[in-house]
Amino acid sequence: MDGVEIIAKSIKNSAIEKVFGIVGVPITPIAYELQAQGVGFFGFRNEQSCSYAASIVGYLTGLPGLCMTVSGPGVVHALAGVLNAQSNGWPMILLSSSIDQSLVGKGGFQECKQFESAELYCKKCYYLTEIDHFPEILKDAIETSLSNRPGPVYIQIPADLIKSKCKESPNIREAAGYGTIAIKSVVPDMKLIKDAVQLLSEAKRPLVIGGKGAAYCRSENELLEFIEATKIPFLPSPMGKGLLRDDHPLVVGAARSYALKNADVVLVLGARLNWMFNFGKAPTFSTDVKFIIVDVDENQASKTKNPNVVPEIAIVGDARLSIAEMRKLFIGETDEQPQPPQDSLIKSMKMEESWWSNLNQDIQVKTKSLATLMSEPQNNDQEYLTYHKVFNALRVGGLFQEDTIFVNEGANTMDIGRLCIPQTLPRSRLDAGTLATMGVGVGYSVAAQICFPDRSVVCIQGDSAFGFSAMEMEVAVRYKLPIVFIVLNNNGVYEGLESMSDPKYTSSTESASLHIPPTSLSVDTKYELIMQSFGGTGYSISTISNLLDICKQIKSKQISLPTLLNIKIKPTGTKPKIVH
């Protein structure tokens, strides 16, 4: 067997069904052999977007996505997705070629310190020295990527090994199953679980925050049972939305600011008290708030290592297992007594009635305020659309189904979209995440549609965010992915210009560089033509009536997908009225 066949067979035997990558010397034969082995290969136009796609696969499926690149620049480009996977805690495998072993340090083709670069962001890096070791390295890489706090790993294969030969060995034939590797969940300390339940039961204004870590470990069923048993208010992080339906009566997303500021005990479940939560500090939180942190990351669930807060109780453990045990303690359920007793801890909870009444009052005010913004009419066809008007039309037009995967990226586009589009299922709202990475949207959408071919995928981006990966429209068309891409086009980053007719913008390159605002992009760019040029469908939209008509055609399958809707919105003065 040659190296190409060994690599492809090992990947196939380990049950990896799809690989994302960009071919080149010397990995092109591997891509062909993967296809011959029945493994789907999805070729992208840039390793950055390709690696973003591989990074989100781990979150969506619970199993690492595999990104394959050439050496040197290919690896460097793909490190964007590796860093994204590391910061979000998602499993991922980056597999790349490198210079022949005999040529290291001699200035060979695309030689660079790629291994050292990958070490900065990966849980573990592997440098292959014998091709017949690849199957066992792949097995270890998968296990490492999935275990404890998930994250990316890197496998580097010198070009001479890819071209080498060896006899087929048992470890090649018997590569451990990708989908069958048993990864043990991190079991929480039951004493700490009991302490957490006691503290929550004594709280007057308790709150549960659920993050994408809780979503990753599939804790939604256990979390729902816990929240409904205790009646403790639940607040999702941006990508924790859908753990409980946004319209569940115990979800307080609309009263986010009030809930955070007034809670006295907060159970943080698979979320980090980072910049999204003002690092757990005032004025976002009360100065005397007590935190219970549950996380598989020992640095987060620690009284000494957490960089932002000293939690009252720190539990290193799987969110699903932890919340299930907490519910049992609250209701008094045991293996010997599966039916809850009459004197369960639920009845002795000290949660104030005013806590819920005040939250509900704030929810009503904020919900009404948001509804007012969204329901503002477009008075005439010449009036600019706004973010809220567009999101309202998309909802009214029925573009979002119960199981739609909503990819949302941009600045204003993402912030307002989080509020305007309700979520009903976990892991179904994908955004810029912990790292606030711009450029992830198209790669995420492609990966989501590949992973879930029977679900609709809607990607809504600002025009700036779309620009990072616009060429990947060709990938969506090539693989016949029925994604709806929507670009909210305000001619800029945050805001743009309504016109560039002023001579100071057009008279010369020097004048343009001195006068065009740094936030401005070209005016009225026809992004829909990008999709059309590849054979997809695209539309320029500037009115609500036109948008509703297009939504109707998409729903009735009168429009072939993928499609891109280039929606023109007000370029200036659109500082969003974020409602929390």
From Swiss-Prot:
Homotetramer. Thiamine diphosphate binds at E47. GO terms for molecular function: 2-hydroxyacyl-CoA lyase activity; carbon-carbon lyase activity; magnesium ion binding; thiamine pyrophosphate binding. Mg(2+) binds at D463, N490. Gene3D superfamilies: 3.40.50.970, TPP-binding domain (3.40.50.1220). SUPFAM superfamilies: DHS-like NAD/FAD-binding domain, Thiamin diphosphate-binding fold (THDP-binding). InterPro entries: DHS-like_NAD/FAD-binding_dom, HACL1-like, THDP-binding, Thiamin_PyroP_enz_cen_dom, Thiamin_PyroP_enz_TPP-bd_dom, TPP-bd_CS, TPP_enzyme_TPP-bd. Peroxisomal 2-OH acyl-CoA lyase involved in the cleavage (C1 removal) reaction in the fatty acid alpha-oxydation in a thiamine pyrophosphate (TPP)-dependent manner. Involved in the degradation of 3-methyl-branched fatty acids and the shortening of 2-hydroxy long-chain fatty acids. It catalyses: a 2-hydroxy-3-methyl fatty acyl-CoA = a 2-methyl-branched fatty aldehyde + formyl-CoA; an (R)-2-hydroxy-long-chain-fatty acyl-CoA = a long-chain fatty aldehyde + formyl-CoA; 2-hydroxy-3-methylhexadecanoyl-CoA = 2-methylpentadecanal + formyl-CoA; 2-hydroxyoctadecanoyl-CoA = heptadecanal + formyl-CoA. The keyword Cytoplasm does not apply. Binds 1 Mg(2+) ion per subunit. Residues 413-494 are annotated as: Thiamine pyrophosphate binding. This is 2-hydroxyacyl-CoA lyase 1. Keywords: Fatty acid metabolism, Lipid metabolism, Lyase, Magnesium, Metal-binding, Peroxisome, Thiamine pyrophosphate. Its main location: other. It is an enzyme of class 4 (lyase). GO terms for cellular component: peroxisome. It is found in: Peroxisome. Its cofactor is Mg(2+); thiamine diphosphate. Belongs to the TPP enzyme family. The gene is hacl1.
